C-alpha cells in the first residue's frame, strides 16, 4: 500500500488555468461629463472596435507592469499609477476562452490626456452621454466602467478632489460643480460647503469676479 503522506501531490499543470488580462478604466471629466478613455483595437479579434486599454499578462510579469505597458503602448499614456479595482471572472466574458480580468482604474486630469487624444485610435466616451457605446464595449468592459464610476463617486464623496481634476486654486463653486458632475446629481450648496471647507486650504486670495462675485480661493489639503 502506498504511503499517502509521501506520495507527491497534484502538479499545478493538473488544474485548468485561465488567461489573465488587465483592463484599465481611465476616467476624467470633460464638457460637464464623466468620461472614460477608449482605444480602437488593432488586434484581429474585435478589430477596430472601441474598448478599454487592455492586454494579457506575460510570463513573469506583474499586474502593475502589464497595466503600465498597456497604457504606454495602446494609449500613449505614461507616468501614472493606476490602482486595482476588481477581478472580473465571468467565464463567458471573452468568446476566445476563459479569461480573468484584473480591472484597474485611474483618474486623470483632462490636460494630461491631451497628447494621447491626438491619436485617431484614442477617444473619450461620456459615461452618461453615450450609453449605447458604453453598453456595447466588448469583453464585459461596460461592467468595468460601471464599477469604476461607482468607485469614483465613493472617493469623491469623502474628499474634495482626490483625482486632481481641478486646476488650483479654485472656488467652492468650481469644486461643487465638479462634484455634481461626478455624482450625476445636484448637491445642496450649504451642506457641501460645511463638509468640504475643512478639508481645503485657503490661499488668502479672491477670484477676479469674472464668473460672478469674487470668491475665496482654495487648494486641496487642509
Predicted feature locations:
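Short helix-coil junctions and helix-kink-helix linkers
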Residues: 177-186
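Charge-enriched amphipathic alpha-helical scaffolds
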Residues: 186-204
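Long, intrinsically disordered, low-complexity Ser/Thr/Pro-rich regulatory/activation regions
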Residues: 200-222
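Short histidine-centered catalytic/ligand-binding loop motif
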Residues: 52-60, 164
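Short Pro/Gly-enriched beta-strand edge/turn motifs at strand-loop
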Residues: 2-10
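N-terminal strand-loop-strand
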Residues: 12-50
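NUDIX/MutT-family hydrolases
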Residues: 103-106, 114-156, 165-178, 191-197
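Active-site segment of metal-dependent pyrophosphate-handling enzymes
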Residues: 18-22, 35, 64-68, 72-123, ...
Amino acid at each position: 500500500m502506498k504511503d499517502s503522506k509521501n506520495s507527491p501531490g497534484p502538479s499545478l499543470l493538473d488544474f485548468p488555468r485561465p488567461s489573465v488580462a488587465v483592463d484599465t478604466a481611465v476616467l476624467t471629466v470633460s464638457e460637464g461629463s464623466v468620461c472614460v478613455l477608449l482605444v480602437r483595437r488593432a488586434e484581429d479579434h474585435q478589430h477596430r472596435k472601441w474598448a478599454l486599454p487592455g492586454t494579457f499578462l506575460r510570463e513573469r510579469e506583474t499586474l502593475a507592469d502589464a497595466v503600465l505597458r498597456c497604457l504606454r503602448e495602446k494609449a500613449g499614456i505614461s507616468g501614472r499609477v493606476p490602482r486595482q479595482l476588481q477581478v472580473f471572472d465571468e467565464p463567458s466574458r471573452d468568446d476566445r476562452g476563459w479569461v480573468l480580468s484584473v480591472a484597474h482604474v485611474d483618474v486623470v486630469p483632462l490636460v494630461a490626456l491631451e497628447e494621447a487624444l491626438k491619436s485617431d485610435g484614442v477617444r473619450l466616451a461620456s459615461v452618461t452621454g453615450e450609453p449605447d457605446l458604453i453598453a456595447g464595449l466588448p469583453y464585459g468592459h461596460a461592467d468595468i466602467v460601471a464599477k469604476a464610476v461607482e468607485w469614483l463617486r465613493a472617493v469623491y464623496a469623502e474628499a474634495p478632489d482626490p483625482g486632481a481634476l481641478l486646476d488650483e486654486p479654485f472656488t467652492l463653486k468650481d469644486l461643487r460643480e465638479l462634484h455634481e458632475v461626478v455624482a450625476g446629481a445636484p448637491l445642496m450648496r450649504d451642506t457641501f460647503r460645511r463638509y468640504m471647507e475643512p478639508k481645503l486650504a485657503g490661499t488668502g486670495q479672491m477670484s477676479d469676479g469674472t464668473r460672478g462675485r469674487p470668491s475665496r480661493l482654495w487648494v486641496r489639503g487642509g
